[in-house]
Amino acid sequence: MMAETLTPRQIVEKLDQFIVGQKEAKKAVAIALRNRYRRSLLDEKLRDEVMPKNILMIGPTGVGKTEIARRLAKLVGAPFIKVEATKFTEVGYVGRDVESMVRDLVETSVRLVKERKMNEVKDRAEQQANKRLVELLVPGKPKQTIKNPLELLFGGQGAQADNSYSHEDEQVEQKRRQVAWQLANGQLENEMVTIEIEEQTPLWFDFLQGAGIEQMGMNMQDALSSLMPKRRKKRRLKVSEARKVLINEEAQKLIDMDEVTQEAVRLAEQSGIIFIDEIDKIARSGAVSGSADVSREGVQRDILPIVEGSTVMTKYGPVKTDHILFIAAGAFHMAKPSDLIPELQGRFPIRVELAKLSVDDFVRILVEPNNALIKQYQALLATEGISLEFSDDAIRKIAEVAFEVNQTTDNIGARRLHTILEKLLEDLLFEAPDIGIDKVVITPQYVEQKLGSIVKNKDLSEFIL
């Protein structure tokens, strides 16, 4: 089944493979994604009228807000970027302008489309790359250069040269056929070959990027570098590495960049997802007032037309933001969603609250997802020939430790598990190459021994866990 035609229930099931709990948030993004598919089936007049319902996620850090949006985008191959609201400044101040988020989205979209197009021509590119490798491994005799152009007219030495090469050419062709066969059978992968590649030289105006020049809606580096001659340098590589470089070069020749650009802009406009994190940090807090609040409100007012739907100039042309899906997120500890300016509140009609993680959630996070942390450590130690196992009681003990440290210090959600597991397995990871055993079982006693004293000492746990 194509990703675009997944039902909301199927989307939630896919997200469940990576994220534990948070059913309401998953349900909201699944409906938003399905609505995009429904909109694509409408006739053109009505299609333009149906706008995406942007989502505001409310919940503490580490509960899955970003991961839900990122996995959703990956699921359907949509261009996705995450930006932090605090990085933007009001127009006229030093810092990034809000339109840069749309430009970044288009860049991501171009990269996605280009990668897909290059994969489509990969077989042809590989054939061309192998031909070039054969020519590099068995170079032909250099063609004789004619110093005097009149020799071409009067059939001098230049005309005689063609016949003298025929026997040598035959030998070269025979040798190349043999080398091509060896290449196809992987017999020359470690042979060294010299290839010419384009040199990536940093230009003097790189520092201008990010200093306000991006507001011109064009990439100055591209404009100026196109006027300068391309420099090539020679590199000596193994055949296996040279093939990758040559495949990339040949694939670039086979794709039409104008077509890539048009498709990328269309993809960004119709399927793009922009995740705006820490939006609560630019809300007017009831406790604080002053110039900082004015600045935050200015950023909100700058974000408003982008979310409402406007046209942003990029180096790939104008991009309409009307149908881009915006997902904003924040913890809202110091502020409330109602502290955002009313116009911006109205542009995020769907609000979902993500729950804090319980001990049971931590247990599930450790073992259930496809990329669960315990599975990652087991795979890492398997490379050293060690089978790592956790008893059920040990997993629960780890979850309890994570929950307790979150309660007594800063609550960083599931990210706490990374710190705790790294501390728990620190000695084992250090000694693994020399330990000389093939199986390790983590028990509750081992967890207590490694982490117990740190957890009990609040000051120590603040620094270590």
Curated annotation (Swiss-Prot):
What are the protein's UniProt keywords? ATP-binding, Chaperone, Cytoplasm, Nucleotide-binding
Q: Output one GO MF annotation.
A: proteasome-activating activity
Q: What is its main location?
A: cytoplasm
Q: Where does ATP bind?
A: 20, 62-67, 277, 343, 415
Alphabetical list of SMART domains matching this protein: AAA, ClpB_D2-small
* InterPro entries documented for this protein: AAA+_ATPase, ATP-dep_Clp_protease_ClpX, ATPase_AAA_core, Clp_ATPase_C, HslU, P-loop_NTPase
Entries under SUPFAM superfamilies matching the protein: P-loop containing nucleoside triphosphate hydrolases
Residues annotated as signal peptide: none
Cell location: Cytoplasm
**Could you give a single Gene Ontology term from the biological process aspect?**
protein unfolding
GO CC, one annotated term: HslUV protease complex
Q: Which Pfam families match?
A: AAA (PF00004), AAA_2 (PF07724), ClpB_D2-small (PF10431)
Similarity field: Belongs to the ClpX chaperone family. HslU subfamily.
NCBIfam families (UniProt xref): hslU (TIGR00390), PRK05201.1 (NF003544)
Could you give the subunit structure recorded for this chain?
A double ring-shaped homohexamer of HslV is capped on each side by a ring-shaped HslU homohexamer. The assembly of the HslU/HslV complex is dependent on binding of ATP.
HAMAP family in alphabetical order:
HslU
Its biological purpose: ATPase subunit of a proteasome-like degradation complex; this subunit has chaperone activity. The binding of ATP and its subsequent hydrolysis by HslU are essential for unfolding of protein substrates subsequently hydrolyzed by HslV. HslU recognizes the N-terminal part of its protein substrates and unfolds these before they are guided to HslV for hydrolysis.
Q: What is this protein called?
A: ATP-dependent protease ATPase subunit HslU
In its UniProt entry, the species of origin is given as Geobacillus kaustophilus (strain HTA426)
